[in-house]
């Protein structure tokens, strides 16, 4: 029988010493680009709803206030004309939606993952774990299995499939990747979030304006990151360290954001006070996350917040007294891609590190050392990840 000392030594050898680190990032979108200024006319025309004049005006105002310039969508006008059930508000259409997402979600994820692996520069055989996250459909074997096949990963790669989590899940996947990387020596975790709105697209209804809000905000996109602890600086270039990660359900928030998979697809329900609920509770989450570091000035850290919509960002800024530039990367991604659910925060990390390098900032976090990543979504669930940036000049050692 092994002694306690032997077991302790084995356990110590299995774990890493340093924090989990983001080593590479890749993103991808469908080729079909939709400009927000044109979208109300297109949306009401393709759904044969132009007779709903007042509702169209409301939708135009939603789009105008969305702070979105463009989005990417797999669903083209041609496909929607061939599948008119997707354009109705409550027509049975799940089969047609599933036919799209079970194929296209892994494919879009592959595009993002391929870019991340290329930037990482290591053989894909070194990937030990795969986390795949999507709110777009469900299937068995899952999108994680399909991506393993598409990428040619080892059949022994340890897979985790997360379906139907929602917009907070960009934080969830990083929290899980952190635990995997830090507790498995030599682990290199491929994280992929891939979202396609084919499961939520539907025509307008004047009694359910919350559904219309989703039509004004959501876009398609996939993002991938490679996560590992104790990077090999001769071959890997670390971007951000993950110092802590937490999840909480906000008080008195049940029913604030719901999604239900039905014969008609994934229906979306939203209460008006979501921005208020988030802004009311965000400082408590920040204080709990940053008190071990002695940080209380929220303008002294960099910000990566899920852009659920402009009202959420506005109220968070107001509540915390944030300077306008704090949400620059977040608002840029919202403007150029819309709300891509779980993939958004990974797009924002990518935007921040690229802009930091372009601007000659000292670190990947806009020149600052510490930052926060927030994910918000159904529950209301909030994910809080504390990030430590690294020098933008950090090159692979030779």
Swiss-Prot record:
Belongs to the thiolase-like superfamily. Chalcone/stilbene synthases family. One of its GO terms (biological process) is polyketide biosynthetic process. It catalyses: (E)-4-coumaroyl-CoA + 3 malonyl-CoA + 3 H(+) = 2',4,4',6'-tetrahydroxychalcone + 3 CO2 + 4 CoA. Pfam families: Chal_sti_synt_C, Chal_sti_synt_N. The active site is at residue 167. GO terms for molecular function: naringenin-chalcone synthase activity. The gene is CHS. Keywords: Acyltransferase, Flavonoid biosynthesis, Transferase. The primary product of this enzyme is 4,2',4',6'-tetrahydroxychalcone (also termed naringenin-chalcone or chalcone) which can under specific conditions spontaneously isomerize into naringenin. Pathway: Secondary metabolite biosynthesis; flavonoid biosynthesis. This is Chalcone synthase. It comes from Callistephus chinensis (China aster). Its EC number is 2.3.1.74.
